[in-house]
Curated annotation (Swiss-Prot):
Residues spanning the signal sequence: none
Protein name (database record): Aldehyde dehydrogenase family 7 member A1
Annotated active site: 269 (proton acceptor), 303 (nucleophile)
CDD domains per record: ALDH_F7_AASADH
Record: residues binding NAD(+): 247-252
Lineage: Eukaryota, Viridiplantae, Streptophyta, Embryophyta, Tracheophyta
Species of provenance: Brassica napus
Self-association state and partner proteins as the record states: Homotetramer.
Family note: Belongs to the aldehyde dehydrogenase family.
First-tier enzyme category under EC: oxidoreductase
Residues of the site described as Transition state stabilizer: 168
Length: 494
């Protein structure tokens, strides 16, 4: 590696080259005929020493899809439990490189090391979950009106599933989709985020090794690094019946319209504008710790980040007092350093958006209680921020992808629910209360309108056993557990 820092030497352990890396695994081969790009370390905005990647061209894409079409004919005929065993082996391969992959994720994306390792572990957990699922893709026997007859319902693979992931969870979202899609008998075409190509390559190399070891077509799992051109090709491609997209509501709507125009299906995981409600009977210390974790973690770049804190008027001052004390103790710094709680935003543009967002907030009557500034020096660091503002302010309805928390006051449970439901997005929500009456109202038809409705836990940290996703402008998709697998298959009744 020459003069490269020793802290980067681990990258060779996960198959990354010291010169340039081909960023596309198509037809069982690594190639690249697109642009040569470099990835930045968000902690200092310097080009990583081995971070040059050759992205996909449209010609590479076409080679990959033709090979994927052929591989689908083989993969869908492999018995589901055997497909599950292949996914088990993928999980084992990831497990063997867990620390290296987690470190790379932190280095390239910017989240702290514990979160980087935890995200890769989530993919491993999804592999384990999918193994069990591979023996439970059950159909139904349905009574028939005809004498001596019955109806059978069974599930068949779609063929190819496109997965377009975002920078903030470059591994986990792949796991939620690909592990399920594979055991359901589908080939996967993955386009990782253009700003996290190294983790895309490293993950794919491990999957490719498993397929090769089992003498299976490499095109069962096709991966490409690239930008909007490749994403648009996936959305338009009639050979891909289902496209899973994670990103902003604006881009997601475009993907949905493009796929729908060809009568394809979409699975959308889009913007979140998540609220935590703290009632007058809540455990204040528990609530304050949870809010800190939900609002500051991943530098506010989770889709499930808590962005709105709804405080009952009787506990408003007490909760804010605890939070303001905790916020001042948050260590901002290199995500790979021990003790860091808040790493950088992912890109310099994100840092600029934070600064612009604070100005908009102030113009709409927002009062900065703590933070509100970018940190001077290298890297994309900003201060964790709490804003006192009216729930009627237009900016509260929007998602600022940064560690910015709006503090809002309410008087009654009904008012809190109304504020929670007043935004276009509907991903995650949580209430802190000891009242069974409030809890059952909260999770019922007159409560939260979000896909995730938590009680006495943060808005983030959804478990893989349940279906992950949201309503309204969040897209309506469901990934990971429960019966999400049905989206990756077609139902046949006979």
């Amino acid at each position: 590696m020459g003069s490269a820092s020793k802290e980067y030497e681990f990258l060779s352990e996960i198959g990354l080259s010291s010169s340039h890396n081909l960023g596309n695994y198509v037809g069982g081969k690594w190639l690249g005929n697109g642009p040569l790009v470099s990835t930045l370390n968000p902690a200092n905005n310097q080009v990583l020493p081995i971070a040059q990647v050759v992205e996909a061209s449209l010609e590479d894409y076409e080679i990959g899809l033709k090979a994927c079409e052929e591989a689908a004919k083989t993969w869908m005929q492999v018995p589901a439990p055997k497909r599950g065993d292949i996914v088990r082996q993928i999980g084992d391969a990831l497990r063997s490189k867990l620390d290296y992959l987690g470190r790379l994720l932190s280095l390239e994306m910017g989240k702290i090391l514990a979160e980087g390792i935890g995200e890769v572990q989530e993919v491993i957990d999804m592999c384990d979950f999918a193994v069990g699922l591979s023996r439970q893709l059950n159909g139904s026997v349905i009574p028939s009106e005809r004498p001596n007859h019955m109806m059978l319902e069974m599930w068949n693979p779609l063929g190819i599933v496109g997965v377009i992931t975002a920078f903030n969870f470059p591994c986990a979202v792949l796991g939620w989709n690909a592990c399920i899609a594979l055991v359901c008998g589908n080939c996967v075409v993955w386009k990782g985020a253009p700003t996290t190509p190294l983790i895309t390559i490293a993950m794919t190399k491990l999957v490719a090794e498993v397929l090769e070891k089992n003498h299976l077509p490499g095109a069962i799992f096709t991966a490409m690094c690239g930008g909007a051109e490749i994403g648009e090709a996936i959305a338009k491609d009639t050979r891909i019946p289902l496209v899973s997209f994670t990103g902003s509501s604006k881009v997601g709507l475009t993907v949905q319209q493009t796929v729908s125009a060809r009568s394809g299906k979409t699975l959308l995981e889009l913007s979140g504008n998540n609220a935590i409600i703290v009632m007058d009977d809540a455990d204040i210390q528990l609530a304050a710790r949870s809010v800190l974790f939900a609002a500051v973690g991943t530098a506010g770049q989770r889709c499930t980040t808590c962005r709105r804190l709804l405080l009952h008027e009787s506990v408003y001052d007490k909760v804010l007092e605890q939070l303001l004390t905790s916020y001042k103790q948050v260590k901002i710094g290199d995500p790979l350093e021990k003790g860091t709680l808040l790493g950088p935003l992912h890109t310099p543009e994100s840092k600029k958006n934070f600064e612009k967002g604070i100005e908009v907030i102030k113009s709409q009557g927002g009062k900065v209680l703590t933070g509100g500034k970018a940190v001077e020096g290298e890297g994309n660091f900003v201060e964790p921020t709490i804003i006192e503002i009216s729930s009627d302010a237009a900016v509260v309805k929007e998602e600022l992808f940064a560690p910015v928390l709006y503090a809002l006051k309410f008087k009654t449970f009904e008012e809190a629910v109304a504020i929670n439901n007043s935004v276009p997005q509907g991903l995650s929500s949580s209430i802190f209360t000891r009242s069974p009456d409030n809890i059952f109202k909260w999770i019922g038809p007159m409560g939260s309108d979000c896909g995730i409705v938590n009680v006495n836990i943060p808005t983030n940290g959804a478990e893989i056993g349940g279906a992950f996703g949201g309503e309204k402008a969040t897209g309506g998709g469901r990934e990971a557990g429960s019966d999400s697998w049905k989206q990756y298959m077609r139902r046949s009744t006979w």
